[in-house]
Amino acid sequence: MGQASSHSENDLFISHLKESLKVRRIRVRKKDLVSFFSFIFKTCPWFPQEGSIDSRVWGRVGDCLNDYYRVFGPETIPITTFNYYNLIRDVLTNQSDSPDIQRLCKEGHKILISHSRPPSRQAPVTITTSEKASSRPPSRAPSTCPSVAIDIGSHDTGQSSLYPNLATLTDPPIQSPHSRAHTPPQHLPLLANSKTLHNSGSQDDQLNPADQADLEEAAAQYNNPDWPQLTNTPALPPFRPPSYVSTAVPPVAVAAPVLHAPTSGVPGSPTAPNLPGVALAKPSGPIDETVSLLDGVKTLVTKLSDLALLPPAGVMAFPVTRSQGQVSSNTTGRASPHPDTHTIPEEEEADSGESDSEDDEEESSEPTEPTYTHSYKRLNLKTIEKIKTAVANYGPTAPFTVALVESLSERWLTPSDWFFLSRAALSGGDNILWKSEYEDISKQFAERTRVRPPPKDGPLKIPGASPYQNNDKQAQFPPGLLTQIQSAGLKAWKRLPQKGAATTSLAKIRQGPDESYSDFVSRLQETADRLFGSGESESSFVKHLAYENANPACQSAIRPFRQKELSTMSPLLWYCSAHAVGLAIGAALQNLAPAQLLEPRPAFAIIVTNPAIFQETAPKKIQPPTQLPTQPNAPQASLIKNLGPTTKCPRCKKGFHWASECRSRLDINGQPIIKQGNLEQGPAPGPHYRDELRGFTVHPPIPPANPCPPSNQPRRYVTDLWRATAGSAGLDLCTTTDTILTTQNSPLTLPVGIYGPLPPQTFGLILAEPALPSKGIQVLPGILDNDFEGEIHIILSTTKDLVTIPKGTRLAQIVILPLQQINSNFHKPYRGASAPGSSDVYWVQQISQQRPTLKLKLNGKLFSGILDTGADATVISYTHWPRNWPLTTVATHLRGIGQATNPQQSAQMLKWEDSEGNNGHITPYVLPNLPVNLWGRDILSQMKLVMCSPNDTVMTQMLSQGYLPGQGLGKNNQGITQPITITPKKDKTGLGFHQNLP
């Protein structure tokens, strides 16, 4: 019964303490308070025996905690001990007159009385010094239990003392705390409360409480040499003291919140801890002698302090502990807890009537956050103006703009500051994008940092949602939360689109003629990061484009090192950087004055002994003049005239010689010089013939050295091309520009710089070069009409991802064939320079409301459907499909007016047959919810159906071409010598189907 009553009193005291703290806007849990008092009972075993709780007794508890921290180290003390201590101290100190606090002290007094140990009534026993030493626990610090009597003036032990003789005093002798088991003298009663002493005795005969405490501790130290030293001597190694065991005190499970150091007292001072408030009985001697004794004790304490072996260590009286990491002192302006702040901010409670039993059943809870005092500074408008200017000039994601934002974010901006900065610096569209990205990243952070149970306000703090939309509340966020806000703001800012960034193809990014290679690679990598994401700027595809899209000068510098396995593009940048210096020197040398051109430029040097022999045998070279003209008015044109051309060769661009004398195989950029057109040795078109009248053979003229002239030369026509040999059937067509062919931009139309028309009574057939298919290039064949006058184009496609076609590459040939006129009927008088290709006449049939239907048999079963010339395959409705015919699901897509994913298809090939006996095989698709069956081109092509238009104009054209109604275009009615391979039946009327009304 007594234990149950004790537990009920404990619960009542803890409940009152929680209510007192809740009034101060502090939330604590019951199990934390129980753990805290359990540690207090372990550290201060005299506290339950004190029988009272007030500010004075609680101050002595703080002294004991400070001594325990100094001796055993911070690792032996729970992290929240000093915080809870400070909270309870403030409750006892600041509101001692409150009825609630008085009731709380009363409940605590009852608990301490119930846990206190009654004083022993055993007769006093004399213990010698040796017995004291043998009975003292070797590994336990002396107890400071306040329930013992202290003998001040005992000299029975015969010990020598530095103090004056106290035999004249009538006070009882002071005893060591180790003698607390002996019965105290009856003339010195034990007083559990100092208030009893003040009410029972005369005020003139009592000591000051401070002097009384000093006297008691000095006397106990004097009579007990093993009393803990009050000076800051080197402390013993820390050890874990044994738990307090008492049969009278039941074990209590306890724990508690976070506190700060008390403001009273100087840390590390040598003052002794306050002993329990044990009041002495009315002294029998004069008070002056007691005061002189007190002065002597203080003098002795001072001397003992001077004898310390080591200087006093600067140990804090009460260490400040918190859950957040320590903030360095050099981080000015960041979040740091105030040293005197020991309150916890009020958190929004979901249920104000939360019971204590719910607190006890919680397995884990969100740790209470301390209040953080920031040296918060609002955003400076000048800084925002700088960021706004950088965004307007360079874009929001430019390196300089991002550097400004990162520098500003080091101040740990709140969500309100980020929103204000986004509205002020970004445009309307970018502001909306930033907000959406910030909210998305905030949700991700909240999910990653979520604990169990999840915090009620975790997802609301990072985006600054209600009730944390106020900037003052946001400034109190802990450093860890502000770090997440900083990271979310920067990530959202860096995800904004670049200024003027258009969605362009990566293959279209080329290096300009005057652009540095590093700038070109930078643009290429930025586009690759924007299209493919970060980490793709060093991929093999980007490296390939860095070579293929570079200008010829950089390509010639990179080409020797292209085959090497390069992990990065840094070596390419080095090669092109050195090559750019050489190009700059060459460009500077091209702008030499005419006088500087007169300087000797020997092509080679030969040392000879006989100049006469050298003049006769040496090849004739253009020699520069040996000396400059002496006449100042002499014309320089005559001097330069004998020096050859004043500009570099247009063919190789390397030397000052004529293009006709150029024998270089590579140009200045290292590119091979490709001879355009056919070979130079080929004769003119047609065979040689002999003029019998004149008696000699006529030879064709020699073709020019460069059959593909530059673009600045006059137009070239088909008749200007040359054949390779007399038996060559085709004329080569070359590209006039450098081209990159990809699967994305193919088919691609390229001009060849050759114009029509063709020779009379001929037409051209465009065919591909035989070696192109092996390179992944496909040239689509075409027909070149006789009267086509525009520029000839060729149509290319590729089967590879990327193919480069240099300028001047031979891609196709024109085969000139004779044109045979059938009749004089034509649609237009001439072709002109319209688009390349054949100008066929299209027969158009007007579609009416009637649907052309056809009945066919599939495996003997009759089906009716609509002729659909736009459908690639036949589709049967699922309602018409027999249930016993097997189906299979195929991984394909059917697209038309609608779309079907993974449709069903016949598992076997079906045989179709029409009413005229024509048959074939198909594998139709089967779709649900299809109202009619569709006959696709897979059946129509096998039936060899043609569409006949009743248009009068079309019919006139067909009749002029030899068409006989009711008959096919036979060999006798068309005028051609070759027969038609397929002759339709002459008795076949129409298309073999009839048109039904819908």
UniProtKB/Swiss-Prot annotation:
The active site is at D868 (protease). Pfam families: dUTPase, G-patch, Gag_p10, Gag_p24, Gag_p24_C, RVP, zf-CCHC_5. Residues 950-996 form the G-patch domain. One of its GO terms (molecular function) is dUTP diphosphatase activity. Residues 863-939 form the Peptidase A2 domain. Matrix protein p10: Matrix protein. Nucleocapsid protein p14: Nucleocapsid protein. Keywords: Aspartyl protease, Capsid protein, DNA-binding, Hydrolase, Lipoprotein, Magnesium, Myristate, Nucleotide metabolism, Protease, Viral matrix protein, Viral nucleoprotein, Virion. The record marks Y163, P164, F318, P319, I585, G586 as: Cleavage. Residues 117-132, 193-206, 323-334 have a biased composition (Polar residues). Residues 115-208, 323-376, 446-469 are annotated as: Disordered. GO terms for biological process: nucleotide metabolic process; proteolysis; viral translational frameshifting. InterPro entries: Aspartic_peptidase_AS, B_retro_matrix, B_retro_matrix_sf, dUTPase-like, dUTPase-like_sf, dUTPase_trimeric, G_patch_dom, Gag_p24_C. This is Gag-Pro polyprotein. PANTHER family: ENDOGENOUS RETROVIRUS GROUP K MEMBER 24 GAG POLYPROTEIN-RELATED (PTHR40389), IGE-BINDING PROTEIN (PTHR40389:SF3). CDD domains: HIV_retropepsin_like, trimeric_dUTPase.
